[in-house]
Swiss-Prot record:
This is DNA ligase B. It comes from the Bacteria. The active site is at K124. Catalyzes the formation of phosphodiester linkages between 5'-phosphoryl and 3'-hydroxyl groups in double-stranded DNA using NAD as a coenzyme and as the energy source for the reaction. One of its GO terms (biological process) is DNA replication.
């Protein structure tokens, strides 16, 4: 009982972290939002089951279906069964499809495995489930999974799939098999190639009329033989002899969750003949098939791969002003996990880009990780019924504004502080945006170099700055005084690359002020436009004032 309670707690914790808390909607708003998403998913279902086509990626469909279920539970609505096909003309399964319960993580799987023995792991092949019925050694019937009890008659279609054995012998001559019809792939690497919408593609081929040639792009992976041989090894051997060789090749004995994790990771990176979305762990000992019912299989569980992309709810739209004055837009998200990384924010880009995306709080966006693990937006997959977008700040900033603090300059001023403290400029180790905000809020800096005047006592008494850290900061601020002249000029935002600035051989502020446009233009990577920007920069009143202030502080290169 304790083990089962631990598993239940693990699942509930996962669900509460994977799904956001209930939205703060009025009953009327909740009804409207639920109804709209319900109608959209119904339309996708109709397209999928009646037309054999999909207008949405499998992963997006699954996650939005989960989101709908969450909303329905939050507001007391009746929940729906995902992917429930129409049952007109449906055929009864000889043995019900149970489905498979999903484990949240390795710990949950370990708890489940602890009370079981003779366990085996298989790939969770991504396709559509099917029942194959053999009578007197011949394929008698093929039935789609449907609702687990009834499905569509796919016999004629499956008979056209050359990879499915049409005749069998021995123990299989009168048998019922359950498996997955999948899209044949050559060297599919799940980690690199993802799901490629395989499930929808298979469904499309099985639902369309007159496509006998294309059906040969399909095959079947048998994962269950109800009432088959008691020993898994015997089952695998008989299946392989009959032509279902993949089952034997991709079924391995496992003793614990560590071994499952090893195989799962191996198959995630290996070249496989099919698309997968995780692994299934099953006990060799199964109840008699007459006891099988949808949703009640206690002898097998799935551990799915983390989706490459996650659907996330936009909680807020925020605007940031960079050191150059450019306004960027950031979406604040309900937390999602991507490759073991908790993602709560994603950069949208410029205001124009944000307007093109048309993103508002309450929308659902598809987020993945780009190079170096940086979150990016792949798509807007659902827009809320009520959409209120914030007004961006006026575009009054540029590369020569906000060296001195003011209310309207708050964001660009902080961005300048973050820039000058970075490793490539003054190298103020141990302070980031939050630290600069705390210092500025407490000590009300006049300009971007005012921190040079802070005393150890002031730093120690700054809310948000730990006392143990204040001494380190004061030491860093003092060390900055010894940085080369070019580093200070970079901190002032000179519109030159470091390479160009080093090539200029400027060693003093007075020398820099007297340099002409022609001088700057001859530097590597500096054209006439950039040279004019340098002239505008050094003639700016705020820059001159900062230069004089640094001279008074006896910073290297600025002394008279």
């Amino acid at each position: 009982m304790k083990v089962w309670m631990a598993i239940l707690i693990s699942i509930l914790c996962w669900q509460s972290s994977a799904w956001a808390v209930c939205p703060a909607w009025s009953p009327a708003r909740a009804q409207e939002e639920i109804s709209r998403l319900q109608q959209q998913i119904k339309q996708w279902d109709d397209d999928y089951w009646k037309e054999g086509k999909s207008e949405v990626e499998d992963g997006v469909y699954d996650q939005l279906s989960a989101r709908l279920t969450q909303w329905q539970r939050c507001f007391g609505n009746e929940t729906r069964d995902a992917m429930m096909p129409p049952l007109n003309g449906a055929v009864m399964h000889p043995v019900a499809h149970t489905g498979v319960r999903k484990m949240a993580d390795k710990n949950a799987l370990s708890l489940w495995m602890r009370e079981r023995s003779d366990l085996w792991v298989q790939p969770k092949v991504d396709g559509v489930a099917v029942t194959l019925v053999y009578r007197d050694g011949k394929l008698n019937k093929a039935i789609s999974r449907g609702n687990g009890l009834k499905g569509e008659d796919w016999t004629q279609k499956v008979r056209l799939i050359s990879a499915v054995p049409q005749t069998v012998s021995g123990p299989l001559a009168n048998s019922t098999l359950q498996g997955e019809i999948f899209l044949k792939r050559k060297g599919h690497i799940q980690q690199q190639m993802g799901g490629i919408n395989a499930r929808a593609k298979v469904a499309g081929l099985m639902m369309r009329q007159g496509n006998s040639d294309t059906l040969n792009s399909l095959a079947v992976f048998v994962w269950a033989w109800p009432d088959g041989p008691q020993l898994m090894t015997d089952r695998l051997k008989e299946l392989a002899t009959a032509g279902f060789t993949l089952t034997q090749t991709y079924t391995r004995a496992v003793k614990n969750a560590d071994e499952v994790a090893h195989v799962r990771n191996e198959w995630w990176k290996a070249k496989l003949p099919f698309v997968t979305d995780g692994v299934v762990v099953r006990a060799a000992k199964e109840p008699e098939s007459r006891h099988w019912l949808p949703g009640q299989a206690e002898w097998l569980v799935a551990w799915k791969y983390q989706p490459v992309a996650q659907v996330a709810e936009v909680k807020a739209i925020q605007f940031a002003v960079g050191k150059s004055g450019k306004i960027s837009v950031v979406a604040s998200l309900a937390p999602v996990m991507l490759d073991d990384k908790k993602v709560q924010r994603v950069n949208i880009g410029s205001v124009r880009r944000w307007q093109e995306w048309d993103i508002a709080p309450g929308d659902q966006i598809l987020v993945s990780l780009a190079g170096q693990g940086i979150p990016r937006i792949d798509d807007v997959v659902w827009r809320g019924a009520e959409r209120t977008k914030p007004t961006p700040p006026e575009n009054r900033f540029n590369s020569l504004t906000c060296y001195f603090a003011s209310d309207v300059c708050q964001e660009q001023f902080i961005s300048r502080l973050v820039w000058l403290g970075s490793k490539q400029v003054l190298g103020l180790d141990g302070i980031g945006e939050a630290g600069w905000r705390a210092l500025h809020q407490t000590h009300r800096f006049e300009h971007i170099f005012s921190w040079l005047l802070l005393t150890p006592e002031q730093l120690q008494n700054t809310p948000g700055i730990a006392k143990s850290k204040s001494a380190q900061l004061w030491h860093q601020f003092n060390l900055a005084r010894q940085q080369p002249f070019t580093r200070w000029v970079m901190a002032m935002g000179i519109p030159l690359t470091r390479a160009a600035l080093n090539a200029s051989d400027e060693r003093s502020w007075s020398q820099l002020l007297f340099s002409t446009e022609q001088f700057w233009q001859q530097l590597p990577g500096t054209g006439s436009g950039r040279a004019r920007q340098v002239i505008e920069w050094k003639e700016n009143a705020q820059i001159k004032k900062l230069g004089s202030w640094l001279a008074a502080q006896q910073i290297t290169g600025f002394e008279p």
